[in-house]
Amino acid sequence: MKNWRIWLILSLTVIAGTIGYFSSALSKNTQPYEGTELTGTAPDFRLIDQNGSDVSLSDFQGKVIVFTFMDSKCKDTCPLTAAHLREAYRQLDQIEAKQVVFLGINVNVRGNAVADVLETTHAWHLDEIPGWHFLTGSRGNLEPVWKDYGISAMPNPDGNSIMHTPGVFLVDPSRQKRWYISTPFSVEGGAEVTLPLSELLVKHIREILRDH
């Protein structure tokens, strides 16, 4: 019971903070949220994808890299994020799509087998994105990656799924961090409208491609 109460307090704190942030931003009639601009070289890592292949971030130097942290056992937010990744890919033209790679990084060490991320890839239709990689590994391999990108993860009371930091990172072809997007899938406030995640991703992908 004690662990449940701790989890509930933490969950309510995170939710309240998120609501407070967006309410404050909208009440001040700020510009639509576009994400947080980042700088610096994206930390490299090597993990295993849903096909059992070793994959590192540096393998994709020369391409725009779009990656997010996902719970392989998630039933709510992560499948929605997956849908927006698929939609973002569909909105790219043929030339653009060849210059972009989409990755997911597992945050669930209780569902970290290759079979887990393969099953989730199929369930969320992420195999519709050519070159998609859902990366996983041991706790010892995953936790340093979470730390490098400021991702926190803790088990939900159901014992299977994980409450974790949401968001999508964009890295340019020189492996420089460009954007972190942590946003509701659509927010309206007065005259300002935050773009859906898929459209925001496409917007930033095209900006990065123009720069290179």
Predicted regions and their residues:
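Thiol-/selenol-based redox modules, centered on thioredoxin-like
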Residues: 156-212
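Structural microenvironment flanking redox-active thiols in thiol-disulfide oxidoreductases
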Residues: 82-145
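Structural micro-motif
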Residues: 131-132, 143, 147-155, 163-169
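N-terminal targeting signals for export/organelle localization
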Residues: 1-44, 48, 208-212
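Extracytoplasmic
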Residues: 40-42, 60-64, 97-102, 129, ...
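Short active-site neighborhood of thiol/selenol oxidoreductases, capturing the structured segment around
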Residues: 55-85, 102-103
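Short extracytoplasmic
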Residues: 33-70
